[in-house]
Amino acid sequence: MAAKDVKFGNDARVKMLRGVNVLADAVKVTLGPKGRNVVLDKSFGAPAITKDGVSVAREIELEDKFENMGAQMVKEVASKANDAAGDGTTTATVLAQAIITEGLKAVAAGMNPMDLKRGIDKAVIAAVEELKTLSVPCSDSKAIAQVGTISANSDETVGKLIAEAMDKVGKEGVITVEDGTGLEDELDVVEGMQFDRGYLSPYFINKPETGAVELESPFILLADKKISNIREMLPVLEAVAKAGKPLLIIAEDVEGEALATLVVNTMRGIVKVAAVKAPGFGDRRKAMLQDIATLTGGTVISEEIGMELEKATLEDMGQAKRVIINKDTTTIIDGVGEEAAIQGRVGQIRKQIEEATSDYDREKLQERVAKLAGGVAVIKVGAATEVEMKEKKARVDDALHATRAAVEEGVVAGGGVALIRVASKLSELRGQNEDQNVGIKVALRAMEAPLRQIVLNCGEEPSVVANTVKAGDGNYGYNAATEEYGNMIDMGILDPTKVTRSALQYAASVAGLMITTECMITDVPKGDGPDLGAGGMGGMGGMGGMM
C-alpha cells in the first residue's frame, strides 16, 4: 500500500480553498451577458472555446493533490446542477465558492463547523420555499423565448427557435440539436411518426424526382417476424388488391421470394406495395411495432400471441392518411388510431420513463412518446467554423434544458435578483444557537454572489449595484446587457426556478461538507526513483580491469 500524506485543520482547509478558488475563478468569468470565453486545449484537434461553466470545470485537474481535492468537489457541484437542470452550472459554482470562503472564515474564527452547516442547511431550505412563492408559470411562447435567449448568452435567434420548436411539437416533444450545413440556424420539424428504416428495394420508388415512395391512405401490415414465403402473404395481398388501396408492410425483414414477388406486383401495377424493416431490435422492436399499431389502429401479427400471417384480414391492418418512405427513413402521417388508445399508450410509456434507471433508456422512451404525441423538432446549428459550431451547439443545448426547466417549475427574475429578494425576506431567520445564526448569515451573504459576479464581469462596481438592487423591491434589478435598472421580468431577463433552486441546493450541499472537513488524506507523490548514475548495466562494476 502506498504511503499517505495527511493534513489536518487549517493546513488542510487552506489547501482545499486554494483548489476551490482556482476552479471557481476559471468558471465564473463566463457568467452573465458580458461574461468572457474560456479556451480549452485539447490533446488532439483544435482548441475548444466555451462559455459553459460545466465544460470549463470538467477540464480542471490540479498538480497539488490537496488543492485538486477542493477543485474536484466544486466540479461535482457544477456536474450535479447540470444533470438536474441542464444549466446554472456557473451560478452553482459561484454560490459554492462564496459559501465555502465565508464558512471557512467563520471556522477559523472559532465557530463550530457542524452548527455552521446546520445554519446553512436551514437557510437553504427556507430559501427554496421562498423561491417557489416568487416563481411564476412559464407557459407562453414569449417567456419561453426569453428564457432560451438568456441561457444562450443573449442570443435571441436561439431563444426564438426553441420557442417555435416547442409550439410545433408541444412542451413534452422531442427537440434535438444537430450540426447544420449553412451559416444560419434552422428549425426542421418532422410531423407524424418517423423511424430510421428505409425501403427494402429501390423498385418500390414511385416518385423518381424525389427518390421516395409515397402511399396515399395505405393499409399497414405489422408483422413481428421475417417474411420469406409469399404464400403466407397471398390472402392479404388479394384482400388489399380488391380494396384498391396501397399496402405498407413493416416486418422484422422481408426477403427472398416474398420480396421479389412484391417488387414484380408493384412494377406490373397489380397492387401498390412497399416494405420496410421494423425499427429497433429485440424487445424495443416489439414495443415500437406496438406503438405503430396504436397510432394506426392496427394489430401486430405475432406468433407469440397465436396470430398467423395467412389468417390476417383487413381488420388487422393499420391505416394512415399518408406514408412517405425514402432511403433511410419512413414517416407515417395521420394514423387513424383512436385518441384514447394513443393517450393510454403514452401514459404507459411515461410510467416506464419514471422507472427507467439509465439515461439511454430514458432518452429512447422519450423519443417514443414524442413520436406518438406529435413529432420531433431538429434545431440545426449554423456556424462559419467547426470551433464556433461546437461552442454554439453547447449554448443551444443549455438553452434547451433551461426552457424545459422553466416550463416544469416556472421562472423567477433573472440576473441574480431572485436570490437577493430571497435573502432579504430571510433576514430575520434564526437558528438554535449563535453559530447556527452565523451559518444562516453565511448562506444569505453568498446569495448576493451571482449578482456581484455578473456586475464585475461588466466592469462595474458590484457593491454599488448590489445596494441599489437591495433598495428596490419585487423584480427590480440590474440589466447587465444594457447597464440599466428596471423590472427584470418586463425586460425579459428570466431564470428558470428549477435552475436557481438546483444551483443553490447543490452548492450548499458540497460547501457544507467542505466546511466540516478537518482532515485530508492523499497518496505521497512518487519520486523519480533512485539515481543509478552513469555507467553500463547493473552488476558490471569492477570489470574495467579486463584489459
UniProtKB/Swiss-Prot annotation:
Primary enzyme class:
isomerase
Looking up CDD domains in the UniProt record yields: GroEL
Top-level taxon of the source organism: Bacteria
Q: Where in the cell is it found?
A: Cytoplasm
Per the record, the coiled-coil ranges are none
**Enzymatic reactions:** ATP + H2O + a folded polypeptide = ADP + phosphate + an unfolded polypeptide
Entry keyword set = ATP-binding, Chaperone, Cytoplasm, Isomerase, Nucleotide-binding
Q: What biological process terms from GO does the record include?
A: protein refolding
Please give the chief subcellular localization of this protein: cytoplasm
Keyword Lyase (UniProt): no
Q: Which GO terms describe its cellular component?
A: cytoplasm
Q: Which Pfam families match?
A: Cpn60_TCP1
Q: Name one GO molecular function term.
A: ATP binding
Binding residue positions for ATP: 30-33, 51, 87-91, 415, 479-481, 495
EC number, UniProt record? 5.6.1.7
Could you tell me what this protein does? Together with its co-chaperonin GroES, plays an essential role in assisting protein folding. The GroEL-GroES system forms a nano-cage that allows encapsulation of the non-native substrate proteins and provides a physical environment optimized to promote and accelerate protein folding.
Query: What HAMAP family does its record include?
Result: CH60
Oligomeric state and interaction partners are given as:
Forms a cylinder of 14 subunits composed of two heptameric rings stacked back-to-back. Interacts with the co-chaperonin GroES.
What family does this belong to? Belongs to the chaperonin (HSP60) family.
> What is this protein identified as?
Chaperonin GroEL
Gene source species = Enterobacter sp. (strain 638)
Q: What is the lineage of its organism?
A: Bacteria, Pseudomonadati, Pseudomonadota, Gammaproteobacteria, Enterobacterales
